[in-house]
Regions:
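Active-site nucleotide/adenylate-binding loops and adjacent lid/helix of ATP-dependent enzymes
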Residues: 5-173
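A long amphipathic alpha-helix within ATP-dependent nucleotide-binding catalytic cores
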Residues: 151-212
Length: 212
């Protein structure tokens, strides 16, 4: 928590939220089914979405869309989120990893593109950033695991401890998809994303794009 003040006015904040945000608005943002419904009613183009069901139903949804996103209905900071899942086994494993955050798990069709974070205050866009997944740069000597640890320390130092790259199942899945593991040595000068998601808390990088 922190406080912004100007003159005699003070507003309490948590990350990008303020005490001006209503409880109803928080609910609409926190529950991703309600978020989807609200944006759909506003006429926006959205990914297909459904609750995870039986393994057969989940596999059929995957076959229909080719690649999926799995996420808990209620959550934040990218916890329990996995993207670009292409096999039934990966989908089911991601569902199990999401359940500790919420028993209700969503499946969505996956679409490539920019990951944007936009801050709106008083119906005015005041900040915008492209979020990029955590990445490492090979030096031909250190293993990918060592490079991740080093980059994670740099991200923690730059963000006051908020950002680090977890060496978890999602990071390992990303490495395996590229043909690597933690013990592999990345060629010198080769840059590689080690996460599919771009959340700040999992090592993601923010690039200001308000003036683009």
């Amino acid at each position: 928590l922190f406080t912004l003040s100007q003159g005699g006015r003070r507003i309490r904040c948590r990350e990008s939220l303020t005490d001006l945000t209503s409880a109803v608005t928080m609910t609409l943002c926190q529950d991703k089914r309600l978020t989807h419904r609200t944006l759909s009613r506003a006429g926006l183009s959205l990914p297909a979405q459904r609750l995870a069901g039986s393994a057969e139903d989940n596999a059929a949804f995957l076959a229909e869309h080719g690649s999926l996103v799995v996420k808990p209905v209620d959550g934040e900071q990218g916890q329990g989120v996995a993207v670009d899942l292409r096999t039934p086994a990966d989908v089911q494993a991601a569902i199990e990893r999401a359940r500790p955050f919420d028993e209700r798990v969503l499946l969505e069709s996956y679409h490539e593109g920019f990951d944007l974070r936009i801050v709106v205050i008083g119906f005015e866009v005041v900040a915008a950033a492209i979020r990029r997944p955590a990445e490492i740069l090979g030096d031909g000597r250190h293993t990918i695991g060592e490079l991740i640890d080093a980059q994670s320390r740099r991200r923690q130092a730059a963000t006051g401890g908020e950002s680090r790259i977890p060496k978890d199942a999602e990071t390992l899945r990303t490495l395996h998809a590229a043909g690597y593991d933690y013990d592999s040595v990345l060629p010198q000068g080769k840059r590689m994303a080690v996460r599919k998601t771009a959340n700040l808390h999992t090592g993601g990088i923010l690039e200001d794009c308000l003036l683009y």
